[in-house]
Amino acid sequence: MVSSKDKIKEELKQEEPEENVEIANTETQKIEMVEEAKSDEFVLPFQRENLKNYLWRLLIIKKVEIRDVILKNSNEPAQVSYIDGYVIDNNELEQRLIKEIVNNQTIPINLLKEVNNHKKEVYLFSTSQGVYYSLLRSVVPKLKNGAVIVGIALQQSDYPQPMVTLVHPSRLEELKTQYEALSKTKKG
């Protein structure tokens, strides 16, 4: 019995140094990250664009981040909305999609497949209060279920200039017509 205990102790002692050697090896090999380019084509790192660059377009939102900031010039608090998503790079397809949503309130599968082939990834930002409230009210609660499709529009507000907001795609044409009519009356 005593000899079997001694044998076990000896085996344990023999195993311990081997474990220390393995740990020592892993501690000397510290690699943070390795990434290799898939092709020789050049790609620029993304830069956030202003949401206003995509007025009167459809936007498929996949990620939203809202940050509280203090503006440098005025020391005023504000919210900056960071939006990651897609725009459709085919105007004809975008118009067909809007008509389909207006008429049926749904998007057929064949049209979805076409949209997936013509979507362009965009990284946007906005300081508009209209966008901030639109995100909180109608986009963020739905993001848990999947990507949300919205229209980027200008809407009349209490301020002298119209406010950028995110609206249901079916309202995009109506708001664009209203905005153009108001612009003509102000000029005329």
Curated annotation (Swiss-Prot):
Residues 1-21 are annotated as: Disordered. Residues 1-15 have a biased composition (Basic and acidic residues). It comes from the Viruses. This is Uncharacterized protein 11. It comes from Sulfolobus islandicus filamentous virus (isolate Iceland/Hveragerdi) (SIFV).
